[in-house]
Amino acid sequence: MITVFSGGTGTPKLIRGLRQILHDHEITVVVNTAEDLWMSGLYVSPDIDTVQYLFSGLLNTDSWWGIRGDSFETFHAMEKLGYTELLPLGDKDRATNIARAEFLRQGMTLTEATEKIAKGYGVSARILPMSDQNVASYVVCEDDSLMHYQEYWVGKRGNVNIKGVVRKTTDGLPLKTTPEVISAIEESDGVIIGPSNPVTSIGPILECAGVREALQNTFTAAVSPFIGNRPVSGPAAALMKAWGYESTSYGTWQVYKDVVDLFIQDVRDTAIEVPGAHRLDTMMTNEKKAESLAWDLLSYFPRK
């Protein structure tokens, strides 16, 4: 079994490649939930939904979010009434979020609700939220005010000067992971930290109490999301700078170096040298390239 740490864009492309090699039931995905939010009475978990739509064959792989061919009748109807959602939800996608919100209101944990929804979609892979706590990433603006990550990236398109990134739990308690996540790490043949944003996608997972300790005893590989000083996608460069790290593969390695046995850097990333890094083609522009990267990556894993 392989466990993958994932956000919502770069890593699902790698998971698509892994699925050409492994059976779905051999893959566990630990998913970032620090970009979740309550919206329109719904509990929206974008990264979890991207992963479960990928496994169920529903994902829109042009945008890498939402359901392929979904309609937006409800979203546009609300716009006419003067209410515009921060995150545009398709109608079928909305059904997922309605169900999740109701399950949580009934007293289910996010782990339980995720399992129930995945079962409904016929997913045999195991999809685990990183935590059952309600947690969010906030950027720290220049005036010291806090802005939810979704407002920063979706609402403001990242056009805000920031100087920090923090995590806040609703219950005010330290962020902790779940027993299911720890078991998945310990029982895996290895863990892959995918090429998602190190600050807002992978960072929250690693900050969950118990995760870094569990990784110390499991072979762990990480794939850099950077080529040069630019991420393949998303706002990782600005966020890394605000977090106090170089917006490069070297900066990413500094975030992960205490938990990784193998660090993968793109073959084109010639200006940056990371100590001990291995070079692979990490540009997953199509399914074949994703499969090729997955094969190469798994070849490094120790046989059990």
From Swiss-Prot:
Annotated residues that bind 7,8-didemethyl-8-hydroxy-5-deazariboflavin are located at 49
Q: Which Gene3D superfamilies match?
A: CofD-like domain (1.10.8.240), CofD-like domains (3.40.50.10680)
- Names of required cofactors: Mg(2+)
InterPro entries in the record? CofD, CofD-like_dom_sf, FbiA/CofD
Listed GO biological process terms: F420-0 metabolic process
- Keywords in alphabetical order: Magnesium, Transferase
Please verify whether the record's keywords include Cell inner membrane. Answer: no
Which segments of the protein form a coiled coil according to its record?
A: none
* ATP-binding found in the keyword field: no
* Family classification: Belongs to the CofD family.
Q: What is this protein called?
A: 2-phospho-L-lactate transferase
Protein's organism: Methanocorpusculum labreanum (strain ATCC 43576 / DSM 4855 / Z)
